[in-house]
Amino acid sequence: MVNVAVGIILVLAQLSGPGASLPQVMEPSYSTEAVAAGRGEVTVSFDVKKGYVINRVPSIQLKLDAIDGLTLRETNMASSPDDPKSTDEYYVDVPTFSLAVESAESGQYEIPGKLVYFFCSKADGFCSRQVLDVKIPLTVE
């Protein structure tokens, strides 16, 4: 019985392959213009790897952590499922997020957070949830 259990474990371990993980299919990019001290805005947009699509439901979520020196108007953002160009459950135009920030002091900041989304590979018939650690760079002048 033990030999059978060990055999099953070995077979399953080989199926996953060494270092097997999901591909990162959506890469965030950030507006690079400096923000004036006071109030400003950072735009977060996304590039999707060829061959993959991003689900409209559940929504794309961007959850940010508060940091010293910056006030974030919103720390939990979710995309709208509406996409007028879409005829199925996937985005044609992946939405962007506008992040309103306030800072009294100039300097370099990094806003840490998590990006959560669901993607599919239509060719493989495979869908999955992905969680990505992000650091949004921000220069306040």
Model-derived features: positions:
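Hydrophobic h-region of N-terminal signal peptides that target proteins for export
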Residues: 5-18
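Extracellular/lumen-exposed scaffold segments
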Residues: 15-141
